[in-house]
């Protein structure tokens, strides 16, 4: 691998801009800054060779530099062909950290980028930090000889976690993994509050559409769907939910949303957002019944929720309006506006989640990497969670920035509740 490129980004000349953006983001990411303060001297990740496959954004750049500060060697690729922020990638490359990512990769380039992160100067990767499971799957299928040397996987997102559990059930998973997604300070913050802000940002930047007065259809009412529905309602849209789960459907109904099927909702909606992580949510028969210039987008991890293939094969005309905005004319004369080719709209058409909420998620990632690297005996092959105490520590690290003052339990109160004054304050099954 001696002839490997030290990095490949769109434009290394963007590094100075990227560095300015990182400086601002650091001030909004108190959890990661706390990790640096606490562990920069002890370097708990010394010896770790972390291959990361996660959206190469400004926030991710702060995560990468935190991992390096804690002693790790790091090589990086993005987990989505459109999600890289080129100035952030340039800043990381300029800092001497191998990164292989640019906005607008082809599928072939995407795979090439991931493969560049597998071998370091001192040997192959020994840790995985993944978002969506593409790196994990690639190692298990194409590079199984590397598996014995890998100490652990930390997985960022719902789709990747589903993949891990599926692999475990089928006896395919060969490496211990920590499910970062289902840490409370990830799923109840990044998935909900992050999407609540970044969805609208993506739709607005792509289309400049007025949301007030429109009918918005949100497929799925998990944490991501909840955040999207709140945002659209907040901007004045009438929101319709589609759901498979009776509990989530009841939650949506109790919040005042109409809940129906996509076969019915497709005739009413002006804006469609898929959030499910499942295949075949919006199909050809739905497109054919949509209103003229219906806006269709996805905020789930992969591009499988919207049948983009059907659009490309059946539309009479496809006009590219601007990057990641395409207008299809159907045989019935009506048009469909598709954002980000059915991939993540908030990263394809905007800048993704704000730095503060990503600090929650990425502090969990750092803790997961430290746990797996320093305590391998605690984590046999399987899918694990971070301890509740660490989840609470992530939240606590972010309170000062918001000027939050916690009430402290007295010894008498703690004894009455049967817990320590310092937590954990909830049982593992508590849902928040």
From Swiss-Prot:
Modification N-acetylserine, positions: 2
E.C. number: 3.13.2.1
**For this protein, what does the record note about how its cofactor is bound?**
Binds 1 NAD(+) per subunit.
Please list the cofactors this protein needs.
NAD(+)
InterPro entries listed in its UniProt record: Adenosylhomocyst_ase-like_sf, Adenosylhomocysteinase-like, Ado_hCys_hydrolase_NAD-bd, NAD(P)-bd_dom_sf, S-Ado-L-homoCys_hydrolase_CS
Sections of the chain in a coiled coil? none
Residues where Phosphotyrosine is found: 193
Q: Provide the residue positions that the database annotates as binding substrate.
A: 57, 131, 156, 186, 190
Annotated positions of the N6-(2-hydroxyisobutyryl)lysine modification? 186
Instruction: List modified residues, type Phosphoserine.
Output: 183
Task: Specify whether Cell inner membrane is a keyword of the entry.
Answer: no
Residues binding NAD(+) are 157-159, 222-227, 243, 248, 299-301, 346, 353
Keywords, ordered alphabetically: Acetylation, Copper, Cytoplasm, Disease variant, Endoplasmic reticulum, Hydrolase, Hydroxylation, NAD, Nucleus, One-carbon metabolism, Phosphoprotein
Catalysed reaction(s) here are: S-adenosyl-L-homocysteine + H2O = L-homocysteine + adenosine
Q: Which PROSITE patterns match?
A: ADOHCYASE_1, ADOHCYASE_2
Q: Which domain of life is it from?
A: Eukaryota
Primary subcellular site in the record, as a coarse category? cytoplasm
What's its job?
Answer: Catalyzes the hydrolysis of S-adenosyl-L-homocysteine to form adenosine and homocysteine. Binds copper ions.
- Disorder cited: Hypermethioninemia with S-adenosylhomocysteine hydrolase deficiency: A metabolic disorder characterized by hypermethioninemia associated with failure to thrive, mental and motor retardation, facial dysmorphism with abnormal hair and teeth, and myocardiopathy.
Question: Could you describe the subunit structure of this protein?
Answer: Homotetramer. Interaction with AHCYL1.
Name of the molecule in the record: Adenosylhomocysteinase
């Amino acid at each position: 691998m001696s002839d490997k490129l030290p990095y490949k980004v769109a434009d290394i000349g963007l590094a100075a801009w990227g560095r300015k953006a990182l400086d601002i983001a650091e001030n909004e990411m108190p959890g990661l800054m706390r990790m640096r303060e606490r562990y920069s001297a002890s370097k708990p990740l010394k010896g770790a060779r972390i291959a990361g496959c996660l959206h190469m954004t400004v926030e991710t750049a702060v995560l990468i530099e935190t991992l390096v500060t804690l002693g790790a060697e790091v090589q990086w690729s993005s987990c989505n062909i459109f999600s890289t922020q080129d100035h952030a990638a340039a800043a990381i490359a300029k800092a001497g950290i191998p990164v292989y990512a640019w906005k607008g990769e082809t599928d072939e380039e995407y795979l090439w980028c991931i493969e560049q992160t597998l071998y370091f100067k001192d040997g192959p990767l020994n840790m995985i930090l993944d978002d969506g499971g593409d790196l994990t799957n690639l190692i298990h299928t194409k590079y199984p000889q590397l598996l014995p040397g890998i100490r652990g996987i930390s997985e960022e997102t719902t789709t990747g976690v589903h993949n891990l559990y599926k692999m475990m059930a089928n006896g395919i998973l060969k490496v211990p993994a920590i499910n970062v997604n289902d840490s409370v300070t990830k799923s109840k913050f990044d998935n909900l509050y992050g999407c609540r802000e970044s969805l609208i940002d993506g739709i607005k930047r792509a289309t400049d559409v007025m949301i007030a007065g429109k009918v918005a259809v949100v497929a799925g009412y998990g944490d991501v769907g909840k955040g999207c529905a709140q945002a659209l309602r907040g901007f004045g849209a009438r929101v319709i939910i589609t759901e498979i789960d009776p509990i989530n459907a009841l939650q949506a109904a109790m919040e005042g949303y109409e809940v129906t099927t996509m076969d019915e909702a497709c005739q009413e909606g002006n804006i469609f957002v898929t959030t499910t992580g499942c295949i075949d949510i919006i199909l050809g028969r739905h497109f054919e019944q949509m209103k003229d210039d219906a806006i269709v987008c996805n905020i789930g991890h992969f591009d499988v929720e919207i049948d983009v293939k059907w659009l490309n094969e059946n539309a009479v005309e496809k006009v590219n309006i601007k990057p990641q905005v395409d207008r299809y004319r159907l045989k019935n004369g009506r048009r469909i506006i598709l954002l980000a080719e059915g991939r993540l709209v908030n990263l394809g058409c905007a800048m993704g989640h704000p730095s503060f909420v990503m600090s929650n998620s990425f502090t969990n990632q750092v803790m997961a990497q430290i746990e797996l690297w320093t305590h391998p005996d605690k984590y046999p092959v399987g899918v694990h969670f971070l301890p509740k105490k660490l989840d609470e520590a992530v939240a606590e690290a972010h309170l000062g920035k918001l000027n939050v003052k916690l009430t402290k339990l007295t010894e008498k109160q703690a004894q009455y509740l049967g817990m320590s004054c310092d937590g954990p304050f909830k049982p593992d099954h508590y849902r928040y």
